[in-house]
C-alpha cells in the first residue's frame, strides 16, 4: 500500500456511529492517510503492509486520537469588550438599564462599525489560535454585530479571510437579524426589509455566507419576521439555522423544523412539541453551556426529552463579548456534563460528529472514517472521558489537518 503517513501505537475514538461501542473506539489501532483523507483505520494487527522506508510513521505512545474538534456556534469576529457591563451587572444593574445607557449588543455594534478589517482580522486570528491549541479544526463564525449592510459585509469578509489564512476551516453564517439597531428601534419590519432586500443579496453576491441565522425571541424578531429571512435564505440555496427558545418558548424551533433548518441553538425553553418537530426534520439541537453559565441562567435545556426523541445534541462555545466571552471549546465539554448532565461521550459527540451535522459537513468531517478529511488530534489521555473531566492543562499533543501535521500557535 502507498500512503502519505501512518499512525500507530494509538487508541482511536472514531466517533463513527457505525462502529459499535462507546465513542466508536478502536483500541490498539492504526490510521493511514492519503491525499488529505483517511485511507484506512482499524486494529494495528490488521494494518496492510506498506513501504515503511518511504512512509512517515508517527507513534502515539499509547495516546488517544479523536476527530478534530468543531465549534459550531461562535460570534468570534468582533471588536471591543463588555467587561464594564459585567461589573455593572454584578453590582445590580439590569440588562435593560445597561442597554438604555448605550451598552449591551449596541456597544459591540458601535465598536465593530468603527473597527477596520485589519483590526478585526487580528483579533479573530488570536481567537482562532486559542481554539487551535485545544484541537479545534473547524469553526463556525457568525456576523451580527454590524446591523447595517456595510458592517455585516465587513464582518463576513473578515471571517472568510480568516478561513483562507488559518489552518482551521471556517464556516460563515450571516446573522444580520441579530438585534434591532437603534435607527430601526420602532420599526423592526423595516429592518427586516433591509436584511432581506439589501443585506442578503449583497452577502450572496460576494459569496460570504454558508448559512443564515436569526435571533427569534421576544426581545428581537418574531416568527413572521424570522420566517421571511429564513425563507429568502433557503430560496437562495443557503443553509438555515436559528437562535430559538433561549428566553421564552415562541415556537421558533417548530418553524425551524418546518423550513428544514440544520440546527436550533440555545433552546433552554424548548418544549416537547418543538422537540418532536426537530426530531422529525433531522434538525440538531445546539446547546450553549457557556452562555448558560455566564448569564447565571436556571432554566435547563430539556436533555432527557432530546435523548428520548434521539435529537443530535451539539455543544458549542457561543463565544461572544456579551453572554459567553469564553474562547474554549474544551471547557464547553466540562460545562455540558456538569451543568447540563450530558455524558462525556455525548459531549464529545457534540463537538465532533453532531457539530458536523449542524454545519452540514458531516459527509466530510466529524468522525474518523475512511474517505473523510484527515482532521484529527492526538491527546495525552488514558480515556476519552478525560477531555470532559479535567480542564486547565492542555492535553492536545498533535493536530493533523487535511492530512498535514500542523504547528500549533503559541
Swiss-Prot record:
One of its GO terms (biological process) is L-histidine catabolic process to glutamate and formamide. Pathway: Amino-acid degradation; L-histidine degradation into L-glutamate; N-formimidoyl-L-glutamate from L-histidine: step 3/3. The keyword Ribosomal protein does not apply. Transmembrane segments: none annotated. It comes from the Bacteria. 4-imidazolone-5-propanoate binds at residues 82, 145, 178, 246, 323. Its cofactor is Zn(2+); Fe(3+). Fe(3+) binds at residues 73, 75, 243, 318. Binds 1 zinc or iron ion per subunit. N-formimidoyl-L-glutamate binds at residues 145, 320, 322. It catalyses: 4-imidazolone-5-propanoate + H2O = N-formimidoyl-L-glutamate. GO terms for molecular function: imidazolonepropionase activity; iron ion binding; zinc ion binding. Keywords: Cytoplasm, Histidine metabolism, Hydrolase, Iron, Metal-binding, Zinc. One of its GO terms (cellular component) is cytoplasm. It is found in: Cytoplasm. It is an enzyme of class 3 (hydrolase). InterPro entries: Amidohydro-rel, HutI, Metal-dep_hydrolase_composite, Metal_Hydrolase. Its main location: cytoplasm. Zn(2+) binds at residues 73, 75, 243, 318. Catalyzes the hydrolytic cleavage of the carbon-nitrogen bond in imidazolone-5-propanoate to yield N-formimidoyl-L-glutamate. It is the third step in the universal histidine degradation pathway. Belongs to the metallo-dependent hydrolases superfamily. HutI family. This is Imidazolonepropionase. It comes from Shewanella frigidimarina (strain NCIMB 400).
